[in-house]
């Protein structure tokens, strides 16, 4: 509800109606004063909460950054390196977000609190002082008027004239106070519209700018998040594969602990008790014994040290070993040995009957050799029947089930697998099995193929080359990694290399249908790494290298065409691709090392500065405003480039070949587009940088046209200059994961007709005089372009983009 204006003429009359209207203004002024106090109070609470929140986030990021992953083994995979660096990347991202927020919080008091407090104290407080003066002068005037009216007419003329002058003077003072008070209260009533709203607007502007920077960082984070999710999934797959092998190893160790021997360790070792004869009788002394069969050396370390004497290990050379007859001694599990260093016989006591058998077997004792309690499955050979079996399995899989989801991952029935293998490898009629029979489904055939390969007497990639292949996969030099594996493949025996080529060619065909069967090279590596490669010893250390076996198979699949194109060049060292300026090494994915964005200038200027429009002299001599009206944000389409050669480091054969047509895609697919951009996608054309490509969806114009913060500084380029828009990488080079210099495309609209872009206002000499020069218009333009650096447009027309 509006208030009637206070006329200056009413100040002289000072009527009851005037006083009533003035009282309404005073009540509104008091309500405004209370409102400003509440805004200041709640604003301080909000700023304090934001500061506390930012401090908590920074403390959280410090906690993340302080943690360092430890690992088992001597080398991490590429995916594990990405995971190990992830907390540091998270902390850097959180710190960047909170640094922007703290800048906004630091300026919030100057933007919101101080202007409101100044208005309340200076304007409203000054109005209250005017009110006090008005009331004081009015009280004095009416009091004097009452006394003046009670003067008797019989007073002297000089006294009456003096009294009249005094009343006129007080009336004049009261009238001036009334005019000043009415002017001031109406001025505050009108000026509060912008003096209160402008600080809140500036505060919201800085708040939304900070939020928009958070949105930009979220877009930067999207491709990193998807790459890290892929690394996490790959690592989880490696873990599942390793866990299965570790469980099998633990199971075997429970059944026969002595069957697993580490390389470089003694043939057998453990605790034995030795019979020692003394003058006062016989004692049994505990020793830790280690026996090396090749040199027949028995090392005995005493466990019970005699007081005052430090005994070291004793090395003895074994001559022979024989089991002690049970009736000849009252102790169990005993056997005798004879050595070159000691005369006579040494009687040893094992811990159990099984333990004595193992010691005697290792020492070639005069007792029947007891075999290991583990009964191995019947080993299969890499012969003609095996090749025939593998070819038949591959043919039926590629004919009937290559698009089956989870191919090779889904396990078939063990009964059916054994039935198929027994029928095919029957010595009476080997290979006489009809794979088209309905009894053999795809899961049974794939499981049978894996079972055959795992139970070969020697793995396809041999024990001899196992360490070299794992060592090559551990290298951080991607070129050496590929070259070394290429060289080692041609060191395999002929039939092994033929079988490996047959299998890898089949796996490449499977991966080409990964959209249907979901089996990527990484997934196939997890399945066939332990199948084609196997350490000779069953140890935990060997199990921890399974993930590198998976990487070897993954590289064979991804670079099948290069590896099997021919043997590498003859040289002492493994061949590597053509030399580069710097070696192409794996680098962990990162978002913290990208280019710094141009920092947005928050609104911190005084209101007086905003009233003057920034003007400059154009080349034709016309004075124009350098502040442009706001333009709706245009989101350019994300360009995709195609390199001439594929990346030999990570390219999947199942990746579809992109054409030059850029299709619209939703926001969730941005990470895929970015990864294609970095791995090599479609080539940039000038049309792609100047406007939407044919077939692309219409640009979605937001309903709220807020100016987004300027992107990270780029090299100046003209429209249509593709080279300045995207730098072409050398073939195969893998950059760090950074966000491309343009915004990702918006989701396409449902409407078929494209929206017409709003025309740019061209400010030229002919219409320069039509620009509104009012204070309101200048302030409006100032706030709409508060994030623009005013100095960047000097020396050119506002509409010039070149």
Swiss-Prot record:
The record marks 409 as: Arginine finger. Keywords: Cell projection, Cytoplasm, Disease variant, Endocytosis, GTPase activation, Intellectual disability, Neurogenesis, Synapse. It holds the Pfam family RhoGAP. PROSITE patterns: PH_DOMAIN (PS50003), RHOGAP (PS50238). The keyword Cytoplasm applies. SMART domains: PH, RhoGAP. Residues 569-588, 607-666, 680-770, 783-802 are annotated as: Disordered. Residues 265-368 form the PH domain. PANTHER family: OLIGOPHRENIN 1 (PTHR12552), OLIGOPHRENIN-1 (PTHR12552:SF2). Residues 616-627 have a biased composition (Polar residues). Expressed in brain. GO terms for cellular component: actin cytoskeleton; cytoplasm; dendritic spine; glutamatergic synapse; terminal bouton. It is linked to Intellectual developmental disorder, X-linked, syndromic, Billuart type: A disorder characterized by significantly below average general intellectual functioning associated with impairments in adaptive behavior and manifested during the developmental period. MRXSBL patients manifest intellectual disability associated with cerebellar hypoplasia and distinctive facial dysmorphism. Interacts with HOMER1. Interacts with AMPA receptor complexes. Interacts with SH3GL2 (endophilin-A1). Interacts (via C-terminus) with NR1D1. Stimulates GTP hydrolysis of members of the Rho family. Its action on RHOA activity and signaling is implicated in growth and stabilization of dendritic spines, and therefore in synaptic function. Critical for the stabilization of AMPA receptors at postsynaptic sites. Critical for the regulation of synaptic vesicle endocytosis at presynaptic terminals. Required for the localization of NR1D1 to dendrites, can suppress its repressor activity and protect it from proteasomal degradation. GO terms for molecular function: actin binding; GTPase activator activity; ionotropic glutamate receptor binding; phospholipid binding. Residues 716-732 have a biased composition (Basic and acidic residues). It is found in: Postsynapse; Presynapse; Cell projection, Axon; Cell projection, Dendritic spine. This is Oligophrenin-1. GO terms for biological process: actin cytoskeleton organization; axon guidance; cell junction assembly; cell morphogenesis involved in neuron differentiation; cerebellar granule cell differentiation; cerebral cortex neuron differentiation; establishment of epithelial cell apical/basal polarity; maintenance of postsynaptic specialization structure. Residues 380-564 form the Rho-GAP domain.
């Amino acid at each position: 509800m509006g208030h009637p204006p206070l006329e200056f003429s009413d100040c002289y009359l000072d009527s009851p109606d005037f006083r009533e209207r003035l009282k309404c203004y005073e009540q509104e002024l008091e309500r405004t004063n209370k409102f400003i106090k509440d805004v200041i109070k709640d604003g301080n609470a909000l700023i304090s909460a934001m500061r506390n929140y930012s401090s908590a986030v920074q403390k959280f990021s410090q906690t993340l950054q302080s943690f360092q992953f430890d690992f088992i083994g001597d080398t991490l995979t590429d995916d594990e390196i990405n995971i190990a660096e992830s907390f540091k990347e998270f902390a850097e991202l959180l710190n960047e977000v909170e640094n922007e927020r703290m800048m906004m919080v630091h300026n919030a008091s100057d933007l919101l609190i101080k202007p409101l407090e100044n208005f309340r104290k200076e304007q409203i407080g000054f109005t209250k002082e005017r009110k006090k003066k008005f009331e004081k002068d009015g009280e004095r005037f009416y009091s004097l008027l009452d006394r003046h009216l009670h003067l008797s007419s019989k007073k002297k003329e000089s006294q009456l004239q003096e009294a009249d002058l005094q009343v006129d003077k007080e009336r004049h003072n009261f009238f001036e106070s009334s005019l000043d008070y009415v002017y001031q209260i109406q001025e505050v009533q009108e000026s509060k519209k912008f003096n209160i709203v402008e600080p809140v607007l500036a505060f919201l502007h800085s708040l939304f700018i900070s939020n928009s920077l958070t949105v930009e960082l979220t877009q930067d984070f999207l491709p990193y998040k998807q790459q890290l999710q892929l690394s996490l999934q790959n690592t989880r797959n490696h873990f599942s594969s390793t866990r299965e092998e570790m469980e099998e190893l633990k199971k075997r160790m429970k059944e026969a602990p002595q069957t697993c021997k580490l390389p470089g360790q003694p043939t057998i070792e453990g605790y034995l008790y030795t019979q020692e004869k003394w003058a006062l009788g016989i004692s049994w002394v505990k020793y830790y014994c280690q026996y090396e069969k090749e040199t027949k050396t028995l090392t005995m370390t005493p466990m019970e040290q005699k007081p005052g004497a430090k005994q070291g290990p004793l090395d003895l050379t074994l001559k022979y070993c024989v089991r002690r007859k049970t009736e000849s001694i009252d102790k169990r599990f005993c056997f005798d040995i004879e050595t070159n260093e000691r005369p006579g016989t040494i009687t040893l006591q094992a811990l159990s009957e099984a333990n004595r058998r193992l010691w005697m077997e290792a020492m070639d004792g005069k007792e029947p050799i007891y075999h290991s309690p583990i009964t191995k499955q019947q080993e299969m050979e890499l012969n003609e029947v095996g090749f025939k079996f593998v070819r038949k399995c591959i043919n039926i899989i590629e004919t009937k089930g290559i698009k089956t989801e989870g191919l090779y991952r889904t396990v078939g029935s063990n009964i059916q697998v054994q039935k198929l293998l027994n029928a095919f490898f029957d010595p009476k009629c080997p290979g006489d099995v009809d794979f088209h029979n309905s009894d053999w489904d795809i899961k049974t055939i794939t499981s049978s193929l894996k079972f055959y390969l795992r139970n070969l007497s020697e793995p396809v990639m041999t024990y001899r080359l196992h360490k070299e292949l794992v060592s090559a996969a551990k290298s951080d030099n991607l070129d050496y990694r590929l070259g070394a594996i290429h060289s080692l493949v041609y060191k395999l025996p002929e039939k092994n290399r033929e079988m490996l080529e047959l299998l890898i060619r089949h796996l490449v065909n499977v991966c080409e249908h990964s959209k249907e069967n979901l089996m990527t090279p990484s997934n196939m590596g997890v399945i066939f790494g332990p199948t084609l490669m196997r350490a000779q010893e069953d140890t935990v250390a060997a199990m921890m290298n399974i993930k590198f076996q998976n990487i070897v198979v993954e590289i064979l699949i991804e670079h099948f065409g290069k590896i099997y194109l021919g043997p590498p060049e003859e040289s002492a060292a493994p061949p590597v691709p053509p030399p580069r300026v710097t070696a192409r090494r794996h680098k962990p994915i990162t978002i913290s090392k990208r280019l710094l964005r141009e920092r947005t200038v928050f609104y911190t200027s005084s209101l007086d500065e905003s009233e003057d429009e920034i003007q400059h002299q154009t080349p034709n001599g016309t004075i124009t405003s350098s502040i442009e009206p706001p333009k709706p944000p245009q989101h350019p389409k994300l360009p995709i480039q195609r390199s001439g050669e594929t990346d030999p480091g990570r390219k999947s054969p199942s990746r579809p070949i992109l054409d030059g047509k850029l299709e619209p895609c939703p926001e969730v697919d941005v990470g895929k587009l970015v990864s294609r951009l970095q791995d090599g996608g479609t080539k940039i054309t000038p049309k792609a940088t100047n406007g939407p490509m044919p077939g692309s969806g219409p640009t979605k114009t937001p309903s709220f046209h807020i100016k987004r913060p300027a992107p990270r500084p780029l090299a100046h380029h003209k429209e249509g200059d593709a080279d300045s828009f995207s730098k072409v990488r050398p073939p195969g080079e893998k950059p760090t994961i950074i966000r491309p210099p343009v915004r990702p495309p918006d989701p396409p609209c449902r409407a078929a007709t494209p929206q017409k872009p709003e025309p740019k206002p061209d400010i030229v000499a002919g219409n320069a005089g039509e620009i509104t020069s009012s204070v309101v218009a200048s302030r409006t333009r100032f706030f709409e372009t508060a994030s623009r650096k005013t100095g960047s447009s000097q020396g050119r027309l506002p509409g010039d983009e070149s």
